[in-house]
Amino acid sequence: MTSLFTAAILGIVEGLTEFLPVSSTGHLIITGHLLGFTGEKAASFEVAIQLGAILAVVVLYWSRFWGLLFPKPGQQFSGIRGLYLLFLTSLPASVLGLLAHDFIKQHLFNPYTVAWALGVGAIMILIVEKKETTPSCFTLDEVTPKLALGIGCFQCLALWPGFSRSAATIMGGMLLGAKRKIAAEYSFIAAVPIMFAATGYDMLKSYKLFTMADMPFLAVGFIVSFLSAWAAVKGFIYLLGKLTLRPFAYYRLALAPLVLFFWS
């Protein structure tokens, strides 16, 4: 299918960018073009190694996920209520994603649409940071059904490859009253069910593209993606205590025209 080196590079890119507001899909498309790894099988490989990044979040927030199954006294984001909040957040993008899956795969997975998504997302990040909404939600236990559903609606923006699911949900959370760090942490946790569902759905449709000979490459991509995502999430949460999202917006603005110029 590809070299182990290519699989490792894609795993690093996936893990480092999946939960940052810079678009993992966009970076994977760009990296794939640079490495000469493109096409339907390449796109499915990139989706498959997302499982490594998903697992990293499950490990980092294991106590929260455990609390969803076995509620802890005094925690509001746990048990049936916590699962209900995640359901509300996952619902809008899940429905729209199922309806538009084939269109997105056929028409939006290319450097040009990604470049525009990077630019539009950057401008929106700067607008949200300038707005400086006064937070009303300071912990995960203060997330309300209204906030969860609102974040879910913003998550639909991430169906445009290059926009970034993390950017969409963190911006949405901030606009709707969540503190920046809490918006990010909720974004990470809420990503798990929808990313797992999207990855599973894609693999059900494309598993015939892979053979046993591809397993080493998938394994390398998965493991490297897990390790990179673990480091990226830890670092990002630390930085959010000191920085805004503006540096990520400037990075996106710098990258977008370069992508358009390079592939025009």
Curated annotation (Swiss-Prot):
The chain crosses the membrane at residues 15-37, 42-62, 84-104, 108-128, 143-163, 182-202, 217-237, 243-263. GO terms for biological process: cell wall organization; peptidoglycan biosynthetic process; regulation of cell shape; response to antibiotic. It comes from the Bacteria. Its EC number is 3.6.1.27. Belongs to the UppP family. Catalyzes the dephosphorylation of undecaprenyl diphosphate (UPP). Confers resistance to bacitracin. This is Undecaprenyl-diphosphatase. The lineage of its organism: Bacteria, Pseudomonadati, Thermodesulfobacteriota, Desulfovibrionia, Desulfovibrionales.
